[in-house]
Amino acid sequence: MGEDRIGFRVVGTVRSVKGHCNAGHKVGDQVELSGHNTGNMCGFFYHDLFPYVIMLQFGGGFPPEWGNPDVVEMSCMDKMNEVTIELKRMRDNE
């Protein structure tokens, strides 16, 4: 696969962990994600994040009532050990 990035950079930052994440994610962890880069995320969590990562990577946005069109916060499906991550589209100056 090529080295050239396609679209915008998308960075995920772990905002909270309730319980113990079996994949080892910790508050403050940052990962770069894309359609071709899972960033070593838990596979189950990445599966849920994928549509949002792709939308941010290729210029889509969220409705105004959600706040910032470049940012979304998501939580994993393990509600006993819930990890919350903020996905952010990085503009050229970030």
Predicted features along the sequence, with ranges:
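Short, compositionally biased
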Residues: 43-60
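N-terminal first-folded block
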Residues: 10-22
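Short, basic/aromatic beta-hairpin or loop at an interaction surface
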Residues: 1-12
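Short, charged beta-turn/beta-strand-edge "cap" motif at the junction between a beta-strand
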Residues: 17-19, 36-41
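Short, compact, well-ordered microdomains
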Residues: 6, 63-94
